[in-house]
Structures are given as structure tokens and as C-alpha cells.
Amino acid sequence: MAIVESIAYRLFYTLFMAVRETNGAVTPRERHRLQTREEILDAALAVMAEQGVAALNLTEVARRVGLRQPSLYQYFDSRTAVYDALFERGWRAHYEILTAAITGQGGGWAAVRLAMRETLRFAAAQPVLAQLLVTRVVPGFVPSDRAYAASLRGLDLVRTAMAAAAERAELHPAAASENGIALLLALVAGVASQHSANEPGVGFAESRLIALLDPALDMYAAYFSPDRPPAWTPWASTD
């Protein structure tokens, strides 16, 4: 749990340092603004947990942080902006988790397995945020390029680790293809969605469904065995 628990502090520190690097120093006013923004996002998550992700009420969010709604717009100019900031926060947090898992294991299949396991731990710990990140639960919401960037960086980490697994003959090269990685992510997303739908409120360690991840990854690795012929491919020809 240490990886997940350290994320909030590290994200705040990242924002803090970003302002410092831009302006040369962080003033008390800037620090207060950053803290207030984070408090607003925390309150938004709490409201979404109670009322539904798509039912975010900014009046209620403002009340919980001691602001009037017009004052909240000094920090976020719309409800969409709050969703966008939460989306960016979530994928930044997930990127930190992937980085810790993959670099800590030195890449390769063991690192990918740990990264997928920590991804499910994150989703179980942050079910409301996970809905926003991986489903289209808010009609019309499209994340900004900036908010989506951390998701793409995380995917690049997985691609690199999967390529290393293929180079080390831990998996067949087809596993490191775009289709192979898409299949891996679909497998993990399936376990996550089953847990979310059928075990609301059940933690990572207690979940019967999350426990299916390890055998599912075993089956994936067996399917993409490095013992298969190099030219083997599971994908239907498009010719």
C-alpha cells in the first residue's frame, strides 16, 4: 500500500515544484491557491462518491470547502475543468504507480505483472476516480491533451517493459505488439470491472475477483509462450 499512500503527497509536491520552477519561488498566496485547488478536488471526489460521478454538484463542493460557488470559479472555471483536473490527477497518480512498479523490478514480465497488480490496487482504493479514468461515465466530457498526457506516458512505460520481456525471451514477441498489449490491458480491465460491479466496497486484499488476476496473467504468459515459433501470430491476417 505504500505506493498508493504516497501518491497524494508526491502529486502536491509536483505541483508545488512546478510553480516554483516557473516563477523562481512559491509565494504564500500561490501555496494557498494550490492547497485550495487540491481541497476542491478532494471534495469533488467525495460528492461524486455520494451522488454519482456524472452528478457532480459544484454548489455542494464549494460548501464543503468553505467557499461560495462564485468564489470556486476563481480556481476552476467550470464543472468540466474540475473533471479535467481530476482526470489529470488520476493518471498522474497511476503513472507514478507504474513507474515505481516497473523501475523497481528492472522491467520485463515480472515488472509488468507487478504494475498490473498495483493498477488494480489503485482502482480498488479509488473506485470513483477509476470510473472517471476508464469509462465514459460523464456525457460529453473529453479530457484535454494535457490531462490525457499522463495516460499516454504510462502506456509507453508498459510498452517498454513488454518489449524488454520479449527481448529477454520471457514472452513471445507478439505479446509486445500493439494488439498484444491491448489484450493485456483488456484482461486487467475486465478483472477491475468485475470487482467494481460485483464487490463494491470490498478492498484489494479481500477481493475474490481481484485474486483472479494472477491466474489470468499466468494464462496470458502461457499463451504468449516464448517457445512458440518466432513467426507465430495469433492475429488474423488482414490481407
Predicted features and spans:
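Basic, helix-initiating cap at the start of DNA-binding domains
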Residues: M1-Q51, A55-E60, R64, A81
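An amphipathic alpha-helix adjacent to DNA-recognition modules
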Residues: L34-L45, A49, A54-A55, G66, ...
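Short helix-capping/turn signature of helix-turn-helix
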Residues: F76, T135-P139
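Hydrophobic alpha-helical connector segments
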Residues: A85, T99-V128, S151, S177-L184
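Helical hydrophobic small-molecule/effector-binding pocket
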Residues: R113-T135, D156, L185-A192, S196, ...
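Key DNA-contact positions within bacterial/archaeal DNA-binding proteins
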Residues: P70
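Short, structured helix-loop boundary elements
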Residues: R37, L58, T80, D84, ...
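Hydrophobic/aromatic-rich alpha-helical bundle segments in the mid-to-C-terminal region
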Residues: Q131, S144-Y148, L152, A166-L217, ...
